[in-house]
Structures are given as structure tokens and as C-alpha cells.
Amino acid sequence: MDPERCAPFSVGPAAGPYAAAGDEAPGPQGTPDAAPHLHPAPPRGPRLSRFPACGPLEPYLPEPAKPPAKYLQDLGPGPVLNGGHFYEGSAEAEEKASKAASFPQLPVDCRGGPRDGPSNVQASPGPCLASLSVPLSPGLPDSMELAKTKSKKRRNRTTFSTFQLEELEKVFQKTHYPDVYAREQLALRTDLTEARVQVWFQNRRAKWRKRERYGKMQEGRNPFTTAYDISVLPRTDSHPQLQNSLWPSPGSGSPGGPCLMSPEGIPSPCMSPYSHSHGNVAGFMGVPASPAAHPGIYSIHGFPPALGGHSFEPSPDGDYKSPSLVSLRMKPKEPPGLLNWTT
């Protein structure tokens, strides 16, 4: 070998772990006291690999890594875990795992390993799946079958004809609770079953009770409509001559008009708007019938009390028209002469 081509190595203060056991530490000048026979450290990475290996460095070069032959001999077709194959080469492990997970296990002929080609996988797994005795979802109920059974129990609605409804209504007008014999006879006439006739009467009674309750509620809300009938009150169009005779001309024989009470106590149209037979107004209000005793009664229409002691003759017509509500409506249309008295 050529010693000039070899790279010089400087020994540091510490020899390191690769120093020999019999070597001594170097002196302060960096030279050993005795022949040290030191060996340099082997290269650890690319930083030390730039020096060429020559001479005594060759035995210390690392050898290329080789896989152990013993490990390759023990290695099987699949990965090894704790001394046994993981899932490909061990069927017992798969059975234990499937039993622990409570899932049905497929037969071995129905499945292929991940390393098998597409030719080894069966195209139709139907017969293999049919061999399973455990259902795919044993804990879930079959909701589709339950829905079918419920839909079958539902009965169709019965459509009654006009003749059947008439016959049923006739019997219902007679009695709301027909006995079994009457229901059977009615079922024969209407071509229905006795059960359908009974159900129809139950529904008809419920409908009748509902209408009765609704009618009572309406009567309780509007009691005036049942106590008084508006049609009995006189209308204005039925007495057109009453409007002309209410206010006679100033030249007539009765200056007071029909709004004054006659001595006989017959009420005038202005005092009694309703056609009730109460006698005179004074008697109806609970006061004596004498017009001279209480002249203040005539102040209702604005007449002075002095007119209470005078007696007036009835109107020239001689007949008293039936009073009505129109007299109250005509009250604001009093003649100017009567309005001047009140002021």
C-alpha cells in the first residue's frame, strides 16, 4: 500500500470507546508516552465517508445489511403476529373472532383471501349465503310483515245507497234504540248485515246528540230571540196613514196634536210605542190615572205644566191609529211652535 494516499488521523484528548484496553492517555503535546497502538473510530455516516479506506481501516468497515435467513424461513404466506399468522393462514382465529363479535361466519368456500386472483372468487354467492342458518339481523323485528298484517285488519268503509238511508232514517224517527229483531228486519230490507245496521244507529245517535248540544248552546247565547219575536211588532210600511196623522196642521181643532193624553186615559201614539194593552201610560208607570193630579207627566214632550189641567177634544179623525216605533223616530221633527214653548 501507499502510505501517502492514506489520510492522516489525529488522536484527540479522549480515545473514545474504540481505544484498546492497554493503551495509555496521550500527553499534553498530543503524543503518547508509550507506543499506544490506537485504532481510529470507524466512519458513522456520510460526513466521515469522504476519507478513503486503506490499510488497517478495511477490517473495520461495516458489512452490508443482510436479512437473517432464520427469520425468512419462519415467515409464512401472511404476516406473523405473536408467533401466529394474523388472518390469512389461521381459520381457527377467524372462527373465534366471529363468535366473539356474534356475527355469522361465511363458509370457507364462499370467500377468498386478499392475495387470491379474481378467478378464485365465486361469481354467485347465493348458495353459499343460503347455507347460513343464522339470520343476518336476528335482533331486529320484521317491520314490513307487521305493517302488512295491520293493513289487512283495516275494514273498508261502507257506502249506503239512497234507499238504504231512507229506510234507516224511517226507523230512527220512530226509535233511536231499535232492538235486535228490528235491526235484523231492517238488515233484510236494506240488504245489509245486522252489525252494519247497529253501527249506523250508533253513529246516527252520536250525530243527533251533537246537534242537540249545539242547539242548546245557541239558545243560551241569544235568549232575546226566543223570548220575543220581532215579527209581532208593527212595521212602518203596514201603517202609512200614521205618519200623516201624527202632526196635524195648525188650523185643526186640536192644537195639542195626538201627543197629548185625552181625559178618558187613552194613550196617544207618542206615549206608548208598543201595542201592549197596559191602559194608559200613567197607570203603566205606576202613577194615578188622573191627568190633573200629576201635571208633570206631560213634561215628557216639553209641554208646560199649565197645560195639564186643560182638556182637549180628540182629533177630528175620531179613530186612534195603532202606535208603533215610527212615533219615536219622528220625535226630532216636532213643529216649531212646540219647540218655542220649551224655550
UniProtKB/Swiss-Prot annotation:
<dbReference type="GO" id="GO:0005634">
    <property type="term" value="C:nucleus"/>
</dbReference>
<feature type="compositionally biased region" description="Low complexity">
    <location>
        <begin position="12"/>
        <end position="38"/>
    </location>
</feature>
<dbReference type="GO" id="GO:0007389">
    <property type="term" value="P:pattern specification process"/>
</dbReference>
<dbReference type="InterPro" id="IPR017970">
    <property type="entry name" value="Homeobox_CS"/>
</dbReference>
<dbReference type="GO" id="GO:0003700">
    <property type="term" value="F:DNA-binding transcription factor activity"/>
</dbReference>
<keyword id="KW-0804">Transcription</keyword>
<feature type="region of interest" description="Disordered">
    <location>
        <begin position="309"/>
        <end position="343"/>
    </location>
</feature>
<dbReference type="GO" id="GO:1990837">
    <property type="term" value="F:sequence-specific double-stranded DNA binding"/>
</dbReference>
<dbReference type="GO" id="GO:0048704">
    <property type="term" value="P:embryonic skeletal system morphogenesis"/>
</dbReference>
<dbReference type="GO" id="GO:0003677">
    <property type="term" value="F:DNA binding"/>
</dbReference>
<comment type="similarity">
    <text>Belongs to the paired homeobox family.</text>
</comment>
<dbReference type="Pfam" id="PF00046">
    <property type="entry name" value="Homeodomain"/>
</dbReference>
<keyword id="KW-0805">Transcription regulation</keyword>
<dbReference type="GO" id="GO:0006355">
    <property type="term" value="P:regulation of DNA-templated transcription"/>
</dbReference>
<dbReference type="GO" id="GO:0035115">
    <property type="term" value="P:embryonic forelimb morphogenesis"/>
</dbReference>
<keyword id="KW-0371">Homeobox</keyword>
<dbReference type="GO" id="GO:0005654">
    <property type="term" value="C:nucleoplasm"/>
</dbReference>
<keyword id="KW-0539">Nucleus</keyword>
<keyword id="KW-0238">DNA-binding</keyword>
<comment type="function">
    <text>Transcriptional regulator with a possible role in patterning of mesoderm during development.</text>
</comment>
<dbReference type="InterPro" id="IPR050649">
    <property type="entry name" value="Paired_Homeobox_TFs"/>
</dbReference>
<dbReference type="InterPro" id="IPR001356">
    <property type="entry name" value="HD"/>
</dbReference>
<dbReference type="InterPro" id="IPR009057">
    <property type="entry name" value="Homeodomain-like_sf"/>
</dbReference>
<keyword id="KW-0217">Developmental protein</keyword>
<feature type="DNA-binding region" description="Homeobox">
    <location>
        <begin position="153"/>
        <end position="212"/>
    </location>
</feature>
<dbReference type="GO" id="GO:0000981">
    <property type="term" value="F:DNA-binding transcription factor activity, RNA polymerase II-specific"/>
</dbReference>
<dbReference type="GO" id="GO:0042981">
    <property type="term" value="P:regulation of apoptotic process"/>
</dbReference>
<dbReference type="GO" id="GO:0035116">
    <property type="term" value="P:embryonic hindlimb morphogenesis"/>
</dbReference>
<protein>
    <recommendedName>
        <fullName>Homeobox protein aristaless-like 3</fullName>
    </recommendedName>
</protein>
<feature type="region of interest" description="Disordered">
    <location>
        <begin position="1"/>
        <end position="122"/>
    </location>
</feature>
